[in-house]
């Protein structure tokens, strides 16, 4: 595949909205979108620049509970969903062989970064705009495998020693 492929990944909701803050970059590369947001289609003008949109169905199942429900997923079901997500990420990385993976989180970041690293990709993590004084769990897990970390609040520079701050995405 093309060696200029940049993969942009984000879970539905706020992570996806923040990822769309990078829309000016999408058309500058052969870009692939990885998401669980089924509303992300080529019908949306800002997404027409993507070479492909890859959906992670396992990412949806990995969520502990659905919005408004207090019922939690069993640990076995959560691990099974996460292993399926890792397999999906492996297949996506193998298919596209991205040079760079950029994510705003959440669920997809860890398996996608691990698979991307094995395939030789550089990784960029953008910490959530919702976090001002504390790292996200995703940030904690990907901090040491990220080639670059960007934070959206200057206060976060104290928590991430190698991070860079350029302001908020949205």
Tell what function each PLM region has.
Residues 5, 30-33, 122, 147-148:
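Residues at the starts of beta-strands that form the adenosine-phosphate
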Residues 15-27:
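Short amphipathic alpha-helix
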Residues 74-99:
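An amphipathic, basic-hydrophobic alpha-helix
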Residues 4-6, 101:
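Conserved hydrophobic helix-helix packing surfaces used for dimerization/oligomerization
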């Amino acid at each position: 595949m093309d060696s200029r492929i940049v993969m942009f990944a984000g879970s539905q909701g706020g992570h996806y909205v923040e990822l769309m803050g990078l829309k000016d970059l999408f058309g500058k590369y052969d870009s692939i979108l990885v998401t669980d947001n089924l509303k992300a289609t080529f019908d949306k003008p800002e997404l027409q620049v993507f070479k492909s949109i890859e959906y992670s169905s396992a990412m949806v199942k990995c969520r502990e509970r659905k919005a408004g429900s207090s019922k939690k997923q069993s640990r076995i079901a959560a691990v099974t969903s996460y292993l399926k997500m890792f397999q999906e990420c492996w297949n996506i990385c193998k298919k596209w062989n991205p040079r760079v993976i950029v994510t705003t989180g959440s669920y997809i970041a860890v398996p996608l970064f691990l698979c991307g690293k094995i395939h030789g990709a550089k990784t960029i993590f953008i910490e959530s705009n919702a976090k001002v004084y504390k790292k996200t769990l995703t940030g904690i897990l990907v901090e040491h495998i990220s080639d670059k970390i960007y934070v959206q609040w200057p206060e976060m520079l104290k928590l991430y020693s190698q991070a860079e701050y350029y302001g908020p995405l949205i």
